[in-house]
């Protein structure tokens, strides 16, 4: 009898456990469905931004480290600025740079940077997880595009120095490091640029970068076809190339825009076709490598474009022209968030329209 009751108890208990598991499974699926629905309906939940658990770190080591908040959801040009600046700051402060993989965007950023500048990322210690609460945050870098002296950081003796800023878009954070950063570009990438011309004794290559896309959406100054065309005329008149053929290579995020205003241009995929104007359809890393090897002169037509900035910085000729941001009505510049001498290297040349009633381009 006792055995019977015991077996009955086990049967009921097992059934209860089974029912509980069924309920839990249904709750989990209902929760997942609700999350997906609300994400689709209200577009507010971003799975990529969900924080990872805190990284495991050790204290009382013999090293000192430097890390920062990162605009990891931004595009490649912004990402390179942040990493190059942190590397430059870490060298100045004699610290080891850290990269915390805080969420899905950080993971994507890391993957893209490893493809583009693997040797630079080898300089960083990579930690899988968010910044632990045991690391305090140090205020630094209040705006995107200006330089703040690191002298205040020199006094900090914390083992882990974590900065509050983002973007770090100033060449002054990595001065005199151009050759080193160029060498960090991925050397294993197959340097086949399609139909794009090669800079040599026969050809002089001018590289023109444009940016439309989200610049139009967010009311940043996007590339203006009138400025692009007239600035190219300015360069043709002022850049002496001797007997070499002039070749113009266009880079940009809006193929329709480029084909509309440069209808005679051929694509980099149009193998065998010869022309004066070409449009690159290559991946970003190939565009950087092409610039390193072939861009004698660079024209940046969207002055806030960080990708265009790096095309100029990595360029073979290290001779860069850009639309003077003072004449674009850029709200970041006008609010003091961008200082031109911090953002643009001093040997780069600003251009502008000659007057409000003229499309002739002149030096600013």
UniProtKB/Swiss-Prot annotation:
Residues 43-364 are lumenal. It comes from the Eukaryota. Residues 1-19 are cytoplasmic. Keywords: Glycoprotein, Glycosyltransferase, Golgi apparatus, Membrane, Signal-anchor, Transferase, Transmembrane, Transmembrane helix. Glycans are attached at residues 60, 128. It is a single-pass type II membrane protein. InterPro entries: Alpha-1-2_FucT (IPR052501), Glyco_trans_11 (IPR002516). GO terms for biological process: carbohydrate metabolic process; macromolecule glycosylation; positive regulation of axon regeneration. The chain crosses the membrane at residues 20-42. Disulfide bonds: none annotated. It is found in: Golgi apparatus, Golgi stack membrane. GO terms for molecular function: galactoside 2-alpha-L-fucosyltransferase activity. GO terms for cellular component: Golgi cisterna membrane. Its EC number is 2.4.1.-. Mediates the transfer of fucose to the terminal galactose on glycan chains of cell surface glycoproteins and glycolipids. Required for axon regeneration after injury. Belongs to the glycosyltransferase 11 family. This is Putative galactoside 2-alpha-L-fucosyltransferase svh-11. It comes from Caenorhabditis elegans. The lineage of its organism: Eukaryota, Metazoa, Ecdysozoa, Nematoda, Chromadorea.
